[in-house]
């Protein structure tokens, strides 16, 4: 078979299906995933931390700001009360996403540049960041409900694996282009200027993302509840035990994952001496390990979404212990080793994780269920970030000694994070059968 015929008959081309509206919807979703990942790579993570540091934000400030997005996401509880009043939501959702992008990428950037007083800047930054994320939380579940029509259950494993390839490629592209530049200018008088300019580049990609998301067909939104009430966000999910158990797992994992996130990145950049590019080796290794995605899909079919997730988490969790021993003199080899293990396990972990919000979600009234998912999962992230920030405040400048090695705050957090991941793994293994969706 010729290469052209293989491409024409491939799963990827079949998934995009140029003859159907659903195929167009998936194409737009994948392109949006590519664009939004570039935006996220610049406006969050290591480049975001470097941007804050270049404008004299401390590790305590960074930890505090890391709490705000997950706190704001908890307010998506108001989303269905607002969105369920509209059967056509395309332009409403686009307006909300545009406002969120402008606040995050334009207003925050200008404030950091022009406001020099540290206290005023932190207060203003917090207010704009909170508003931006509040707007996003109000509209994000609307996109999820709309786009879920394009990925029926039989296509999800394939769709999410290709989405993972695309988003990882976007992360790799953006972080290598912008990460190398940030590392080259680190410590120079141009560092803050270039990191600021990157956020305006991200704004351009964000505007294109808003346009792309307006293109798919919008289907009617099925619902069983005639009245639109806030209490339905709690009342409806309480009827579905499997859904609740799934959301509890998501919340627990988000708590664990958020515990050390911002502090660890700050520690790598400023205490270990790793550059932005080095801190994102995960993306390099992931793009290599993505060739194993078909095998992870087969494992999901053979075992289950949840058991695959648990086995991958068993590989991921011990890397926290490896990372805790990273030092300026050994990070060149130890950090890549831990990151490679994370990338290998991360393919299966992220593939199974992507379906978690949907696997046990009822087909009707999905705005309520997905809003409940966002609230509880965001609450887990918020509590994890808050616990991490409190840990930094309490143990800042303190050390413990293990096996003759002195650990300061950030490595100490990784020991705690390892324990939190173990709790999640045990939860899945004990409840695997009860978590399985009905056929």
Model-assigned labels for residue ranges:
Residues 3-76, 80-83, 90-93, 105-108, ...:
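Helix-loop boundary and gating motifs at the non-cytosolic
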Residues 85-101, 190, 301-314:
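Cytoplasmic membrane-interface "Motif A"-like loop-to-helix N-cap segments
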Residues 75-91, 182, 292-305, 392:
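Helix-to-loop junctions at the C-terminal end of transmembrane segments
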Residues 59, 153-163, 275-276, 361-375:
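Loop-to-transmembrane helix entry/capping segments in MFS-fold secondary transporters
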Residues 97-119, 314-330:
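C-terminal ends and interior cores of transmembrane alpha-helices
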Residues 34, 103, 119-139, 332-349:
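Hydrophobic core of transmembrane alpha-helices in multi-pass small-molecule transporters
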Residues 49-54, 81, 85, 108-116, ...:
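Transmembrane alpha-helix termini and helix-breaking/packing motifs in multi-pass membrane transporters
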Residues 1-28, 116, 121-126, 130, ...:
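Intracellular loop-helix junctions on the cytosolic face of multi-pass helical membrane proteins
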């Amino acid at each position: 078979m010729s290469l052209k015929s293989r491409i024409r008959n491939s799963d990827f081309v079949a998934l995009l299906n140029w003859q159907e509206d659903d195929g167009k919807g998936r194409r737009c979703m994948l392109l949006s995933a590519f664009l939004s990942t570039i935006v996220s790579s610049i406006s969050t993570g290591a480049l975001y931390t470097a941007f804050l540091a270049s404008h004299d934000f401390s590790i305590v400030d960074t930890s505090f700001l890391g709490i705000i997005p997950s706190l704001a996401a908890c307010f998506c509880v108001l989303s269905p009360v607002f969105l369920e009043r509209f059967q056509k939501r395309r332009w409403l959702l686009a307006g909300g996403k545009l406002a969120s992008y402008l606040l995050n990428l334009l207003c925050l950037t200008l404030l950091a540049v022009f406001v020099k007083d540290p206290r005023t800047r932190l207060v203003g930054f917090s207010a704009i960041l909170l508003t931006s994320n509040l707007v996003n939380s109000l509209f994000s579940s609307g996109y999820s409900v709309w786009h879920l029509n394009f990925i029926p259950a039989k296509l999800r494993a394939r769709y999410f694996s290709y989405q993972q390839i695309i988003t990882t490629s976007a992360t790799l592209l953006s972080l290598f282009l912008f990460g190398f530049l940030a590392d080259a200018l680190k410590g120079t008088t141009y560092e803050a200027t270039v990191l600021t300019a990157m956020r305006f580049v991200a704004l351009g990609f964000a505007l294109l993302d808003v346009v792309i998301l307006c293109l798919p067909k919008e289907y009617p939104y099925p619902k069983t509840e005639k009245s639109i009430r806030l209490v339905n966000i709690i009342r409806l999910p309480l009827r579905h035990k499997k859904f609740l158990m799934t959301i509890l797992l998501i919340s627990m994992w988000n708590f664990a994952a958020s515990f050390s996130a911002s502090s660890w990145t700050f520690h790598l950049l400023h205490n270990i001496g790793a550059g932005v590019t080095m801190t994102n080796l995960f993306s390099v290794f992931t793009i290599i390990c993505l060739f194993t995605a078909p095998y992870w899909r087969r494992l999901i079919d053979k075992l289950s979404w949840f058991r695959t997730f648990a086995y991958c988490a068993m590989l991921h969790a011990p890397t926290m212990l490896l990372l805790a021993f990273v030092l300026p003199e050994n990070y060149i080899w130890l950090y890549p080793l831990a990151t490679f293990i994370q990338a290998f396990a991360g393919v299966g972990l992220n593939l199974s994780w992507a379906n978690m919000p949907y696997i046990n979600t009822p087909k009707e009234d999905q705005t309520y269920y997905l809003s409940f998912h966002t609230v509880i999962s965001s609450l887990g992230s918020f509590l994890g970030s808050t616990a991490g920030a409190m840990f930094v405040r309490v143990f800042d400048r303190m050390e413990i000694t293990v096996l003759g090695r002195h650990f300061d705050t950030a490595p100490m957090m990784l020991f705690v994070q390892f324990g939190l991941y173990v709790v999640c793994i045990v939860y899945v293994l004990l409840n695997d059968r009860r978590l399985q969706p009905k056929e």
